[in-house]
Amino acid sequence: MTARIIDGAALSQRIREEVAQRVQALTAKGVRPGLAVVLVGDDPASQVYVRNKVAACEKAGLHSVKEQYPADLTEAQLLERIDALNRDPSIHGILVQLPLPRHMDAHKVIEAIAAEKDVDGFHISNAGLLMTGQPLFRPCTPYGVMKMLESEGVALRGAEAVIVGASNIVGKPMAMLLLQAGATITICNSKTRDLGAQTRRADVLVVATGKPGMIDGSMIKPGAVVIDVGINRGADGKLCGDVDMASAREVAGAISPVPGGVGPMTIAMLLVNTVEAAERAAA
């Protein structure tokens, strides 16, 4: 068996085209969706992510504002800037690129973003709405994973779904979305005993640990759908995921690649959330 590849790049392109149509409809009403991306410091990976997000916005016709500040910006100064963006009617979404410098409290900064502009879906109000099945914004990466599963026609109702990684950004919201779709959920973390015994039960396996090649083919149920959220640099300098692709694709039924899988979908769903924010503001 050789797993079919879930092409996140192609799916994200279709979603971006749909976003562009929605942007045109809003623009015709005098509303141009606007996203502000705030970057503090000079982390190279963050700069790449921000550049990709801004480029995607512009290509889809959204108004994008990139605000970059030095690493010695004070937390008070950042909060003041976020407050100004909250009050700016031309900005419908605000994204603060993580990680922040150590002298800043990331939770405090995220909570300062108006919930209706929190297009990352990290604000505690949006996390609570997601928990109760009434999400205002779904976090972009888990949202993208759900779209990938939908595109593959994966039957989630009654399926065994195992998530490796319990972060607030991916693991926990991923569990909520899969649970709401009718799947039976297991979340694994660094304390999980016999990880392979858990992952081999999964009809759907989502891996988000930041550890290259952590999951190999021996840990996968034959025919399972595997979504690799990880993005790492291997010893050879190339991008790789948390799943060992060579062995996994001989066992899985379908698998997302790295790169070209979840990454493009995360950006696509950020655009979707921003357009939804603009549509609500225009209603």
Swiss-Prot record:
Pathway: One-carbon metabolism; tetrahydrofolate interconversion
Pfam families (alphabetical): THF_DHG_CYH, THF_DHG_CYH_C
Residue positions binding NADP(+): G165, A166, S167, S190, I231
Chemical reaction(s) catalysed: (6R)-5,10-methylene-5,6,7,8-tetrahydrofolate + NADP(+) = (6R)-5,10-methenyltetrahydrofolate + NADPH; (6R)-5,10-methenyltetrahydrofolate + H2O = (6R)-10-formyltetrahydrofolate + H(+)
MF terms (GO), sorted A to Z: methenyltetrahydrofolate cyclohydrolase activity; methylenetetrahydrofolate dehydrogenase (NADP+) activity
PROSITE patterns linked: THF_DHG_CYH_1, THF_DHG_CYH_2
Gene3D superfamilies linked to this entry: Leucine Dehydrogenase, chain A, domain 1 (3.40.50.10860), NAD(P)-binding Rossmann-like Domain (3.40.50.720)
EC assignment: 1.5.1.5, 3.5.4.9
InterPro entries: Aminoacid_DH-like_N_sf, NAD(P)-bd_dom_sf, THF_DH/CycHdrlase, THF_DH/CycHdrlase_cat_dom, THF_DH/CycHdrlase_CS, THF_DH/CycHdrlase_NAD-bd_dom
GO CC annotation: cytosol
Keywords: Amino-acid biosynthesis, Histidine biosynthesis, Hydrolase, Methionine biosynthesis, Multifunctional enzyme, NADP, One-carbon metabolism, Oxidoreductase, Purine biosynthesis
Biological process per Gene Ontology, one example term: methionine biosynthetic process
Function text: Catalyzes the oxidation of 5,10-methylenetetrahydrofolate to 5,10-methenyltetrahydrofolate and then the hydrolysis of 5,10-methenyltetrahydrofolate to 10-formyltetrahydrofolate.
Stated family: Belongs to the tetrahydrofolate dehydrogenase/cyclohydrolase family.
Subunit structure: Homodimer.
Protein name per Swiss-Prot or TrEMBL: Bifunctional protein FolD 1
